[in-house]
Amino acid sequence: MFTVFLLVVLATAVVSFTSDRASDDGKAAASDLITLTIKGCCSRPPCIANNPDLCG
């Protein structure tokens, strides 16, 4: 029974850790998009070509 408890705790910790890292990546991408937009990057074709994932 104790082994099952440890497995559940470990699985919960792994899921929590990976979902936290995914949300951090999303925040970084949003911050990059805001920075590019403020600088006017997404209105210039060469910049759009260099950042297609951010300028969409």
Curated annotation (Swiss-Prot):
The UniProt record lists the keyword Transmembrane helix: no
Record's signal peptide: 1-16
Disulphide-bonded residues: 41-47, 42-55
Post-translational modification: Exists in 4 different forms, depending on hydroxylations. Tx1a-PP does not contain hydroxyproline, tx1a-OP has one hydroxyproline at position 45, tx1a-PO has one hydroxyproline at position 46, and tx1a-PP has two hydroxyprolines at positions 45 and 46.
Region (Ser-Xaa-Pro motif, crucial for potent interaction with nAChR): 43-45
Site (Important for binding with soluble acetylcholine receptor): 44, 46
Main location: secreted
Propeptide: 17-39
Any one GO CC term of the record: extracellular region
Compartments where located: Secreted
Tissue and organ expression note: Expressed by the venom duct. Tx1a that containing 1 or 2 non-hydroxylated prolines are mostly present in part 5 of the venom duct (distal part near the pharynx), whereas tx1a-OO (with 2 hydroxyprolines) is mostly present in part 4 of the venom duct (follewed by part 3).
Gene Ontology molecular function, alphabetical: acetylcholine receptor inhibitor activity; toxin activity
Cysteine amide PTM sites in chain numbering: 55
InterPro entries per record: Conotoxin_a-typ
4-hydroxyproline PTM positions: 45-46
Transmembrane parts of this sequence: none
Keywords from the UniProt entry: Acetylcholine receptor inhibiting toxin, Amidation, Disulfide bond, Hydroxylation, Neurotoxin, Postsynaptic neurotoxin, Secreted, Signal, Toxin
Family assignment from sequence similarity: Belongs to the conotoxin A superfamily.
Biological role: Alpha-conotoxins act on postsynaptic membranes, they bind to the nicotinic acetylcholine receptors (nAChR) and thus inhibit them. This toxin inhibits rat alpha-3-beta-2/CHRNA3-CHRNB2 (IC(50)=3.5 nM), rat alpha-7/CHRNA7 (IC(50)=392 nM) nAChR, and the L.stagnalis soluble acetylcholine receptor (all tested without hydroxyproline).
Further details from the record: Shows no inhibition on alpha-4-beta-2/CHRNA4-CHRNB2 and on alpha-1-beta-1-delta-epsilon/CHRNA1-CHRNB1-CHRND-CHRNE up to 10 uM.
Domain notes: The cysteine framework is I (CC-C-C). Alpha4/7 pattern.
UniProt name for this protein: Alpha-conotoxin TxIA
Source species taxonomy: Eukaryota, Metazoa, Spiralia, Lophotrochozoa, Mollusca
